[in-house]
Every structure is written in structure tokens, then in C-alpha cells.
Amino acid sequence: ENIYTLDSKGELLITIMSSLAQEESRSISENVTWGHRKRFADGKVSLPYKRFLGYRKGADGLPEIVPEEAEIVRQIYKQFLEGKSYYAIAKNLTDRGIPTPAGKEQWHIRTIGSILTNEKYKGSALLQKKFTVDFLTKKTKVNEGEVPQYYIEESHPAIISPEEFELVQAEMAKR
């Protein structure tokens, strides 16, 4: 733009242009957020496939089960219901050389806990668990009722039956 920044006119132009750019960024952010919320309200579910064990994006764009990974998820639920701890399950998977959802060698108890508490494995989805607080910093926050959440049942194929999922939740509450 050939702006001379050493005089007051140049500084004023830069200030105005940066304000316009920031406003454009805010507008785009609001439009994207609106689009996400519209999809949620319409019951359309998308999963973080790269870090989500047992599912991949199908040819039609919808979640489909990866049989080998789904079997690992079933084993985790089964072992927990047999009385094994998060640590014992994680150690078993690590010892067997099964990679984590992120592709790492070492399983952690947080990963096991996350799999056991994730409603998506029973074919349902709670959407908007987190939301973006500030479009500039991209800071997110756990949704504690500030924005609407959407719970969609039977939104995609289940790996775990709803009954088994509820048994695991009850067992977790007992422990």
C-alpha cells in the first residue's frame, strides 16, 4: 500500500486498516460459529476422526466404524466391567503394542477414562461441550450453560450398546 509509517497520516491509516481487519476477523468468526450451531441444531454430528478410536469419516461424510479399532474399545469396556482399573487397562494395551488414538505407544489412564465416559461410543453425541470465548485468542471454555448444548441420540453407529455404557457409568460412580 506504500504507507509512510513515520508520519501521523501513515499511523492513522495503519490504525484504521488494522481495525477493519479485526472487524472482518470477528465477522468471519461469528459466521463460522453460527454455521456450527446451525449444524448442531439440525442434528448433524462430526467427530474428531484423527484422535477418535473406532471411527473414521465414511465416503458419505458420516461416521463409520473401523472394526479393528472398535474391538479395542469393546475390550476396554469389557475389562473395566470385569473390575480392572484404568491403570491395568492402559498397561495391558501398552504391553500388547496397541497404539493410542493419537498414535502413541504409551496409554495413559486419562485416555482410558475419556473412552469410558464418551457418549459417542454408544451412538449418541453431546455437542458444544466447549465453546470459543474470544475470537482473537481462540480461547475455549467448558460449556457450563453459557451457550446451548445439543444431545443427539442414535446420531451414528454405536460401538458399545447404551446398556453397557450405562453399566460402566454406574460402576464408575461406585468406584
Task: Give a label for each model feature.
Residues N2-R175:
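Conserved catalytic breakage-reunion loop centered on the nucleophilic residue
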